[in-house]
A protein has these predicted regions:
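Conserved, mostly hydrophobic/aromatic
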Residues: 7, 15, 36, 116, ...
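Active-site beta->alpha loop and helix N-cap motifs at the rims of alpha/beta catalytic domains
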Residues: 48-165, 172, 178-182
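Surface-exposed amphipathic alpha-helices with a cationic face
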Residues: 67-75, 127-137, 187-198, 248, ...
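Glycine-rich phosphate-binding active-site loops on the catalytic face of alpha/beta enzymes
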Residues: 116-119, 176, 223-240
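C-terminal helical cap(s) of enzyme catalytic domains, especially alpha/beta-barrels
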Residues: 236-258
């Protein structure tokens, strides 16, 4: 029986997060938004993930203004965001009142679909966000963080899918952020999950890093998947996703037709091609990110993590150490209970791998985040961590066994009080909650711009500014 396959376009979020460390500006998006809205996509993934942090930290943009702008220009297409469960859009666990408020404000400002995931596939870390999305009338799509390792059988993922369904999800996504899926594994996994929870639509998300993405998507559709994540061709391949146009063409005229017209992509493709050329010329897009690297199947490193690792090593003048760091990543992952590599665990494991290589002595220097991961502060790892390794890393520190957020008191009112002088919109407290220093810097720049102050010329000590 024929069924229309849903296509989610990632150009406005994950594609540029994977290729250029999330540096696409709202101004660069504006000329193409109206055209994207006319294509007929199931959804546009345009917000969440690292975009929030990047807007505030690097682009001097208000992420909420970006969301409202995209909503205004795309009234006919569902807008989608990536949400890290109890980690929200930040890198630690937040109290339930913060999680609920971020979900509420996201939907109020235009988000339709919230793709919620937990880096450890710990359902305890997802329930608050799922309930909040249900309450606000949003679509809660819960993502399974796909990875490989001794415990990660089809049965493991089926059991997790059942828990996701029981928690109130509206759909499920297989999120293969590290491009570890193979075509045959995709087929078996999709069949197993669809058989276990046939009532929930199943979306497929994979990256092109290892060169297998298009084959995986095709096998997944044939096995029963209902939707695909793709990227417009100039922002596809490499550490990004399968090209949208190629998948539309591959499924055209089959029982899995997407209903999209290939001719409609011409203007959009041309526009993003000019952006791609600009990014390459400026050095923002490293051509290495566009290459196929089958070693991803060995190193288990997601696209966004790979581009950020390369960026970090360049800044440290240690670019030649990339292969050593990539080889160290799976070893650190094994030591820390086989966490799937997705934010924030990808950053935690990646940074620890960098430290291990650069210092020349493994674990002689550990980040607080890595210690927290080993101590259970992010949830229960898929595999138990060796008690001797735990003692080596955290000493006699107490290990958290339950839901980490249960240790947290409500935060919102306290946070509002701390930034009362800076608040210009309800959402500002969420920026401050997730990125305190970055948000304060942004608030100050915003205030200065409104009163005509150039922060570079302001003498803060004497509170003097030249006219």
């Amino acid at each position: 029986m024929a069924k229309k396959i849903r296509v989610t376009e990632t150009a406005l979020r994950d594609a540029h997060q994977s290729l250029i460390a999330t540096r696409m500006t709202t101004e660069e998006m504006l000329p193409v938004l109206d055209k994207l809205d006319k294509i007929g996509y199931y959804s546009l993934e345009c917000w969440g993930g690292a975009t929030y942090d990047s807007c505030l930290r690097f682009l001097n943009e208000d992420p909420w203004d970006r969301l409202r702008t995209i909503r205004e220009h795309c009234p006919n297409t569902k807008l989608q965001m990536l949400f890290r469960g109890q980690n929200m859009l930040g890198y630690r666990h937040y109290a339930d009142d913060c999680v609920e408020y971020l979900v509420q404000r996201s939907i109020a400002n235009g988000i339709d679909i919230i793709r919620i995931f937990d880096a450890l596939n710990d359902i305890k870390n997802l329930k608050t966000a799922i309930k909040a999305a249900n309450k606000e009338g949003g679509h809660a799509q819960v993502a399974i963080s796909y990875t490989t390792g001794p415990v990660f059988t089809d049965e493991y993922y089926v059991e997790y899918a059942k828990r996701i369904a029981d928690a109130g999800a509206d759909s499920i996504c297989i999120k293969d952020m590290a491009a570890l899926l193979t075509p045959t594994r995709t087929e078996s996994l999709v069949k197993a999950i669809k058989a276990a929870v046939p009532e929930l639509p199943l979306q497929l998300h994979t990256h092109y890093t290892s060169g297998l993405a298009s084959m995986c998507l095709l096998k997944g559709v044939e096995a029963g998947a209902d939707g695909l994540d793709t990227a417009i061709s100039p922002l596809a391949l490499g550490t990004s996703h399968a090209p949208t146009e190629s998948m539309v063409a591959a499924l055209s005229g089959t029982e899995f037709d997407t209903g999209l017209d290939l001719k409609q992509f011409s203007d959009i493709r041309a526009y993003f091609m000019t952006l791609r050329e600009k990014y390459i010329k400026s050095g923002l897009l490293d051509p290495k990110m566009l290459a196929t690297d089958a070693n991803a199947l060995i190193y288990q490193v997601p696209g966004g993590m790979l581009s950020n690792l390369l960026s970090q090593l360049k800044q440290a003048g240690k670019e030649d150490k990339l292969d050593e760091v990539l080889a160290e990543v799976p070893r650190v992952r094994k030591d820390s209970g086989y966490p799937p590599l997705v934010t924030p665990t990808s950053q935690i494991v990646g940074t620890q791998a960098v430290f291990n290589v650069i210092t020349g002595k493994r674990y002689s220097m550990c980040t607080n985040e890595f210690k927290g991961l080993v101590a259970g502060e992010y949830g229960t790892t898929p595999m138990p961590i060796d008690p001797e390794f735990q003692k080596k890393i955290i000493g006699d520190k107490k290990i958290i066994k339950g839901r980490p957020a249960d240790q947290l008191e409500p935060e919102l009112d306290k946070l509002r009080g701390e930034i009362e002088q800076w608040i210009e919109q309800p959402e500002d407290v969420l920026s401050y909650a997730q990125f305190p220093k970055v948000a304060l810097d942004f608030f100050e720049k915003r205030r200065n711009a409104k009163v005509g102050i150039n922060g570079d010329k302001l003498d803060k000590k004497n509170m003097v500014h030249p006219v």
